[in-house]
Amino acid sequence: MARSSKRGPFVANHLIREIRNLNIQKKRKLITTWSRASAIVPIMIGHTIAVHNGREHLPIYVTDRMVGHKLGEFVPTRNFRGHAKSDKGSRR
């Protein structure tokens, strides 16, 4: 089920607090977070947020087109190596 519109989007408290402090100081620095479920809200535009993918933090520059999406959507967690090459000897 989708989240109720009257409740608003989920954003981790530490993330909101840090972004608001940076906006007040008019600074832009890298913000690291493990909160992949946090939604991107308009106050995040212009910030770079490093989101954890299970192994490392990958930086994401937030633009206006990302508003409404989740942070985890922009960081892939799985590493696809490709299918095995055609090996006719292994078929039999």
From Swiss-Prot:
> Keyword set for this entry?
Chloroplast, Plastid, Ribonucleoprotein, Ribosomal protein, RNA-binding, rRNA-binding
Subcellular localization(s) per the UniProt record: Plastid, Chloroplast
A molecular function (GO) held by this record is:
structural constituent of ribosome
Q: Which GO terms describe its biological process?
A: ribosomal small subunit assembly; translation
Which InterPro entries would you find in this protein's record? Ribosomal_uS19 (IPR002222), Ribosomal_uS19_bac-type (IPR005732), Ribosomal_uS19_CS (IPR020934), Ribosomal_uS19_SF (IPR023575)
Which GO CC terms are listed, alphabetically?
chloroplast; mitochondrial small ribosomal subunit
Q: What's this protein's function?
A: Protein S19 forms a complex with S13 that binds strongly to the 16S ribosomal RNA.
Similarity-based family = Belongs to the universal ribosomal protein uS19 family.
Q: What is this protein called?
A: Small ribosomal subunit protein uS19c
Species, as recorded: Adiantum capillus-veneris (Maidenhair fern)
